[in-house]
Amino acid sequence: MNITKIISKTFDSRLKQIDLYASQASEIQHRVLSRLTRQAAQTEWGRKYDYSSIRNYEDFRKRVPIQTYEEIKPYVERLRAGEQNLLWPSEIRWFAKSSGTTNDKSKFLPVSKEALEDIHYRGGKDAAALYFRINPDSHFFSGKGLILGGSHSPNLNSNHSLVGDLSAILIQNVNPLINFIRVPSKKIALMSEWETKIEAIANSTIPVNVTSLSGVPSWMLVLIERVLEKTGKQALEEVWPNLEVFFHGGVACTPYREQYKQVITTPKMHYVETYNASEGYFGTQND
């Protein structure tokens, strides 16, 4: 029995939603904007721009100017210090550390529980749903998914918040049930020292039936090369014969394609690009 065929049926409702927003993107965006302005109306930011009187996109466009990170940074710093209800009504304790592109300094982006559930985790579910639609004979759930992420740490300036790579925040807050189908353990996954982490992941996952990979192409390549080095194998499918898909994001995979062809030689391997950033989950490959 292919258990993946059974479990993948639970993703059918998401496929209907995906088809809907693919055909009605504009209308859905307007509804989302209305919902967000209503929810944030009583925050300090919402009161500043009178969110409660915004009725449509035109109102929002005229009322709220485009702003840089530096302009909202004072709000972010106050959130990091423990203040709440500034930009969003629910408690903010997590901050995704994003590399700056304008002033070479890291940006700290607030991550709410709604952002985790309604954006990042939902985006991951959508990526899986689309993959199962395109590959109905998948054996994805016959093994475990190897997820390679970053790390997090307490905010050095405050006891009220935690800072880390988005991938680490996702691993830290994921539904505990997911831990039964993913490797490595959370303790190993969130290690901060890179070389020690790669070694620990390789040692703990080599004996496992890994069917999928998720992570940044450049990071994953380092791990794959370490696994091959430790096992003496020439190709990753010799270590994990049921490996079938790599969900990759963070950076473009194109510069690494040739290297991946050398370490994963089976033509059955699938590559699914996801556009997930600290700011949100923006898209998933659909072919």
Regions inferred by a protein language model and the residue ranges of each:
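Active-site phosphate/ATP/adenylate-binding loop shared across adenylate-forming ligases
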Residues: 1-287
